[in-house]
Amino acid sequence: MLTKPKVAVVLLNYNGQHWLQQFLQGVLATDYPSLEVIVADNSSTDDSIVWMREHHPQVRIIQLEQNAGYAGGYNLALKEVEGTYYVLLNTDVQVEPGWLQPLITCMESNPTIGAAQPRIRAYHNRSLFEYAGAAGGWIDILGYPFARGRVFDCIEADTGQYNDNVEIFWASGACLCIRSDAFARAKGFDANFFAHQEEIDLCWRLQLLGYRIMAAGASEVYHVGGGTLPVGGRKVMLNFRNNLIMLSRNLPISERLWVIPVRWILDVIAAWRALLQGRGQEFIGIARAHFAVIGWWIAGKHRHIEGKKPLHRLMGVHRGLLIWDFYARGLKTFTEIISNGK
């Protein structure tokens, strides 16, 4: 009988004792023979560590000295983790015993597969996909992310339409399976992101290194969503800032020269629309994001990316304009957009 590859499931925790109490036991019940479950704690101020040591002393805990966010926290924690595969799992994700094997089977099917995700359904409405990744992430030519099963805030019911194994652009950070050597080769997440869209940036860089990103349709998990960082101006700021930084760094200059100005204009429109509709925190968040990007450029914090390719040559890229397809043409689902998008 062949030995199963070692898998380390790493949960990054920040003041998530209530999530650990609710979901950690399910992770420990995973049906996989070569598994280590690790909790990396991002300097929590609640009783997460005390509770784990009392109720789950067998779980290895990696204590980080400060809250380094999702990106920096995982970068630090994974330096202390061994395994063929890492599975980065949010603490607010519920799993069933058989969730992991389909992910590993997908990864093992081809050595060029660098990362994969399961189908992610909503914990509170289980017939629907969940916002953060749904059945696998795509991106359009302006850098707007969407997913099979979720376009902007329009979320589909899971009727089995995305149960296949298929290449995508990005795998969700809510449940991300990645080869440990691929993570190291890509030099991990960009810690400057802190949180939000760091997994899209990483998957983009993995594709530039020649890896494929997959959705493993036979694997299914349930995600509460928004379990760590509350909705507000900071969340908006991080999303807008990180998206612009990702585009600035990963696009070849021939595309960067027109994509960034167009996105800048569209972001300004989005900011004023939010303000006129009474969403002042969103307006402030977008404004702060743009000032932060200017500071990022001036400070020279960007990392040089080798082997840049035109975005449309990568997998999981919609060559049309998502905002036009969605708002002007009325295409609300992934299938409609990919089938009819221009």
Model regions and ranges:
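Active-site-adjacent helix/loop segment of glycosyltransferases
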Residues: 10, 209-328
